[in-house]
From Swiss-Prot:
Keywords: Cytoplasm, Methyltransferase, S-adenosyl-L-methionine, Transferase
UniProt source species: Chromohalobacter salexigens (strain ATCC BAA-138 / DSM 3043 / CIP 106854 / NCIMB 13768 / 1H11)
EC number: 2.1.1.-
Reaction(s) the record says it catalyses: L-lysyl-[protein] + 3 S-adenosyl-L-methionine = N(6),N(6),N(6)-trimethyl-L-lysyl-[protein] + 3 S-adenosyl-L-homocysteine + 3 H(+)
CDD domains: AdoMet_MTases
Protein name as catalogued: Ribosomal protein L11 methyltransferase
Annotated compartments: Cytoplasm
Entry's family note: Belongs to the methyltransferase superfamily. PrmA family.
Gene designation per UniProt: prmA
Length: 299
């Protein structure tokens, strides 16, 4: 059965409004993608992706009355958005395909550093003897596909984590905490403001045979007043600046720090905030416009 596909180019801050209108008119699925093919796969829960222009695509299985439906969408948009013009919505018929299989085919195992692989559940591990982290790709939380997550994973892979205690602040899927444990850490703590993130971390820990006694998960306000050998935070530049005193307070003397979720143009502001806390910082590492900042606490 063919599908009716609608597509519109829209400013990111207005994408949710159009998405809601199309869903109300029976869209089976809505997807959002960067218009310039540089997607942010891991936005914080409840936030808008950091794109200049978004391509919104909707699929419908009802092929009749498309023009009346679009007219209703335009009228409702005008009622809700005042002077903001409704974006142009194009449509076409597309052949029926195995959408789930095509989505799965887009994701292959990813190697992070020298030892670590992130492996989707439907793939065989390319190197069974390597450190294999089983994690399926998703949009809400880190899965290794985004440069910021990849930068943090590669950094962890390069550390000697044997018997260390690790804090993953803003843990999302738990990917960084779980990776640290599989790379030799004695204990990891993951903290996040989103209960869905904490649940995702629990689920992924179980999938990777992480014992409960090696991983603690909590909200930030319940974080124990203790120091860690390694602190990693892959969030956003603004919160990282605000959290500088907190994150540094959780570092043991000589402990290692990694920060990401930072656009290249924001790096200096973030680095200044951590220099003020006495951190000894390395040169930032950039990938696809995003940077990782690492450093060491004074001994």
């Amino acid at each position: 059965m063919p599908w009716l596909q609608l597509k519109a180019h829209i400013a990111p801050q207005h994408a949710e409004t159009l998405e809601d209108l199309l869903l109300a008119e029976g869209a089976q699925v809505i997807t959002l993608q960067d218009a310039h093919d540089d997607p942010v796969f891991e936005p914080e829960s409840g936030t808008t992706p950091l794109w200049n222009e978004t391509v919104l695509t909707g699929l419908y299985d009802d092929l009749e009355d498309i023009e009346p439906m679009l007219e209703r969408v335009r009228q409702q948009w005008a009622a809700e958005m005042a002077d903001e013009p409704c974006p142009e919505i194009d449509y076409e018929l597309v052949a029926d395909r195995d959408w789930e299989r095509e989505w799965m085919d887009d994701f292959a195992p990813l190697k992070m550093g020298e030892r670590l692989w992130v492996v989707p559940s439907w793939h065989e591990a390319p190197e069974p003897g390597a450190v294999n982290l089983l994690l399926d790709p998703g949009l809400a939380f880190g899965t290794g596909t985004h440069p910021t997550t990849a930068l943090c994973l590669a950094w962890l892979d390069g550390l000697d984590l044997d018997a260390s205690r690790v804090l993953d602040f803003g843990c999302g899927s738990g990917i960084l905490a779980i990776a640290a444990l599989k790379l030799g850490a004695r204990h990891a703590t993951g903290t996040d403001i989103d209960p869905q993130a904490l649940q995702a971390s629990r689920d992924n820990a179980q999938r990777n045979d992480v014992a409960d006694e090696h991983l603690s998960l909590c909200y930030p306000e319940r974080l124990a007043d203790e120091r860690h050998d390694v602190v990693v935070a892959n969030i956003l530049a603004g919160p990282l600046v605000e959290l500088a005193p907190t994150l540094c307070a959780h570092l043991a003397p000589g402990g290692r720090l990694a920060l990401s979720g930072i656009l290249a143009g924001q790096a200096e502001e973030v680095m200044d905030a951590y220099r003020e806390q006495g951190m000894l910082l390395d040169a930032p590492v950039e990938r696809e416009g995003w940077v990782r900042i690492t450093g060491k606490a004074p001994a």
